[in-house]
Design a protein with these regions (language model features):
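Polysaccharide-binding surfaces and accessory modules of carbohydrate-active proteins
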Residues: 23-25, 30, 36, 43, ...
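Short, well-ordered beta-strand segments enriched in hydrophobic/aromatic residues
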Residues: 96, 107-115, 644-652
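Conserved, mostly hydrophobic/aromatic
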Residues: 111, 236, 281, 354, ...
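Beta-strand-rich recognition/accessory modules
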Residues: 171-275, 567-569
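Carbohydrate-binding surface patches
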Residues: 176-177, 186-187, 580, 628-669, ...
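Aromatic-lined carbohydrate-binding/catalytic grooves of carbohydrate-active enzymes
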Residues: 277, 281-418, 429-431, 439-443, ...
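Glycan-recognition surfaces
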Residues: 371-372, 376-414, 418, 465-595
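C-terminal beta-strand-rich structural cap/linker in extracellular carbohydrate-active enzymes
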Residues: 678-707
Length: 707
């Protein structure tokens, strides 16, 4: 069918598999639909509506033509692109890009608006706000339950983003209440569906919203920042929307969650490295401990070649795969040059030590900083952030020469990506930790988020909206050049572009050390403090409670995409708590490795050695949980269809705990000393755990042929 030319009256089947079918009719009311074999209900979207040259134009299409595809991508997804001219504005063309696979019911699609060659028009905002409707969808077929799912509420108590769910009642539809999403799920008698968009922000800030109506419809519309007023559109300079997601499954919420989780793990991104369940070590907590507990007053004192090489050796004993050098390794931002005072032989010697152990290197970066004296700044002077006409002031980044904030929504993004590619090739860096990225701060008319024909406020909104799309472009450029590369976006503070968009390219660094004293209304003077600003920095159960909060996402989004670090410190009970926590997916270790006793190193090495034999199974398994985070007991079961996986039982009180697994299990590969495992007639495990004090019990299951 490649190149087939159709009138808009025909249905174009893009993917007619057992997983999903996507049809484009191109009509105003029936523009694009998603259906599922064996399910009567379908998701039908109306045509998008743009404001072009001051007039509202519905993008119903004439003469739809496939111009590309189906093209099979590396993640077993096929991409096709279809175009047609707008009936009501014939000099405009709309492209519809669809990604689908017979292996997942979740479909991604986006729109691209361009002009006919030799013509142009503008996207306008006659009412001084975004005038863009992405489509309306009838959800009347799913009346059992409708739920808004917010992924971006920042919880000050855990000092992390949290998942929350909000019912969308019939009264909400009657009163045309708007919901921010980014996901809405709807459940009927025999099927369930979801609608979602890929963007990012911290609630309640939103750039798009789902508007309900008494007719049982959802209209997804732009709120602000989706495009700058007077945005020129030509044949070469097309306007491209964000990606949207839709899915239908047989069953209910559990089946929908499992399908979406599998989509996020395998089919959402082409950058497969971000989904690998490596065990990470990061130097930052050791640097913090030295400043506050070592009384050095300096985050950088420990960071030198000798110390790093010693820590690499210990990390290898513990079972770490990726060793991340946090702030301290660079002499200046922008060019990201190694600090030769701390590392007189460069980082090549660290690279060689890591190679010897079969480990990988990671480094810290801030994409929004460039030293004034750097070559990067010289090449990208016009990309410096400005706000209200004032350039970013000069400031020092971790005691390095003066830097200025630089805008990623500008041509600079390519230069930054290419510099990281150079570093990756030189030092075998596969992991990039990105930190310090505020979503706000630039309204310059000289970048790629609006020009002088619109207002400062409009350009600032567009910067905030576009930031995550440009971050993803950087990640994708890096991963195209460095297969297996991983970019981790630190969202441990508020005001960052958290949502579904970045997950199409990378993963999140979810939690640092939890709340500050000030979050708990405890007076803390940042200027004169002599104690650590974080409350939960000690071994034991409490810090792990906070860091496990991100496991709430695991039902829908795999926990491997939310990196958290756990402490390997004695006593034994704390070691088990932290081991069990990181095995559930967050997969990080930090702290002062040189204070971990030999028996602790052996425990981590043995336990993580066993875990690595089943970690792919653990990552793929949908979670079963009994008890809330911090409860006693709090039980997590991660057993894959083949019976491999693990169970972790946390308890805060002395006494016995018994648990029967929901799934049949393979033989025991490794277990902690405080658990007895039996098997029932169905092959499920009966776990009898004994706790003398707060601790965790861990058991890992694996078939012999899996080892």
């Amino acid at each position: 069918m490649n190149g087939l030319f159709l009138t808009a009256a025909f249905v174009v089947a893009l993917a007619a598999t057992g997983a999903a079918a996507v049809d484009i009719r191109g009509d105003a009311a029936d523009f694009l639909s998603v259906s599922r074999s064996g399910v009567v209900e379908r998701l039908t979207f109306s045509a998008p509506v743009f404001e072009i040259n001051g007039a509202s134009v519905t993008a119903a299409l004439e003469r739809i033509e496939r111009v590309r595809g189906p093209r099979r991508l590396a993640n077993s997804v096929e991409e096709s692109v279809w175009t047609g001219s707008l009936r009501d504005f014939p000099s405009a063309r709309l492209a519809v890009t669809v990604r689908s696979s017979d292996l997942t019911p979740v479909v991604r699609f986006k729109y691209g608006l361009s002009s006919a060659p030799g013509t142009s028009f503008r996207l306008t905002k006659k009412a001084k706000r975004d005038a863009l409707v992405y489509g309306t969808c009838d959800v009347s077929g799913w009346g059992v339950a409708r739920t808004e799912m917010r992924f971006n509420e920042y919880d000050a108590l855990s000092h992390a983003y949290r998942l929350s769910e909000h019912g969308m009642t019939s009264r909400a539809f009657e009163n045309r209440i708007a919901f921010a999403g980014p996901m809405v799920r709807v459940v009927g008698e025999t099927s369930a569906a979801l609608l979602a968009y890929e963007s990012g922000s911290q609630a309640p800030l939103t750039f798009l919203e789902f508007v309900t109506a008494p007719e049982q419809t959802l209209t997804l519309r732009a709120v602000k920042g989706n495009y700058p007023a007077n945005r020129a559109v030509t044949d070469e300079n097309r306007f491209e929307t964000i990606w949207f997601q839709a899915a239908i499954v047989k069953g209910g919420t559990s089946e929908l969650a499992a399908a979406y989780r599998d989509f996020q793990l395998k089919y959402c991104t082409l950058n497969a490295g971000s989904r690998k369940p490596y065990v990470f070590y990061n130097t930052w907590a050791a640097q913090e401990r030295d400043k506050w507990w070592g009384k050095s007053g300096d985050y950088m004192r420990l960071m030198n070649e000798k110390r790093i090489l010693e820590d690499v050796d210990i990390a290898h004993e513990l079972g770490v795969d990726v060793f991340v050098v946090d702030v301290s390794w660079f002499r200046q931002t922008g060019d990201w040059i190694v600090d030769e005072k701390r590392f007189p032989r460069g980082l090549g010697v660290v690279r060689e030590r890591l190679r010897r152990h079969g480990m990988k290197m990671g480094l810290w970066f801030d994409p929004t900083e460039a030293a004034k004296i750097s070559g990067m700044m010289a090449r990208n002077r016009r990309s410096v952030m400005s706000f209200n006409g004032v350039e970013s002031p000069e400031h020092s980044v971790w005691s390095t020469p003066g830097s200025q904030k630089i805008c990623v929504v500008s041509p600079y993004w390519r230069d930054f990506a290419d510099r990281l590619i150079e570093i990756a090739k030189e030092l075998d860096v596969v992991y990039f930790k990105w930190d310090g990225i505020s979503q706000f701060g630039c309204d310059s008319p000289d970048h790629e988020h609006g020009d002088s024909s619109t207002t400062d406020a409009d350009r600032h909104d567009c910067y905030s909206f576009e930031q995550v799309r440009y971050l993803s472009k950087i990640v994708d450029r890096i991963c195209d050049a460095i297969p297996g590369a991983i970019v981790d976006f630190d969202v441990t503070e508020g005001g960052r572009c958290f949502g579904l968009a970045f997950l199409s390219s990378g993963k999140y660094f979810a939690t640092n050390n939890g709340p500050y004293y000030s979050n708990l209304d405890v007076p803390y003077d940042w200027a004169t403090a002599s104690v650590w600003s974080n409350v939960l920095v000690h071994p034991g159960p409490a810090r792990a409670w906070i860091c496990r909060a991100s496991l709430d996402y695991d039902r829908w989004i795999p926990s491997v995409l939310f990196l958290c670090h756990f402490l390997p410190d004695a006593p034994r009970e704390s070691e088990l708590i932290n081991l069990g926590s990181l095995m559930l997916g967050p997969s990080g270790v930090w702290g002062n490795l040189q204070t971990v006793p030999p028996e602790g190193r052996r425990l981590f090495g043995e336990a993580l050695g066993a875990y690595k034999k089943v970690r792919d199974d653990v990552t793929s398994a949908s979670p079963v949980r009994v008890g809330r985070i911090g409860a006693s007991p709090e039980i997590h079961e991660k057993i894959a269809a083949n019976g491999n996986g693990l169970v972790v039982v946390f308890a805060n009180e002395a006494g016995d705990q018994v648990y029967v697994t929901e799934h049949a299990v393979s033989p025991v590969l490794w277990q902690s000393e405080n658990i007895v495992v039996e098997r029932d007639a169905q092959g499920c495990a009966i776990l009898r755990c004994r706790f003398d004090r707060p601790s965790a019990a861990i058991v890992i299951f694996a078939k012999e042929e899996s080892l």
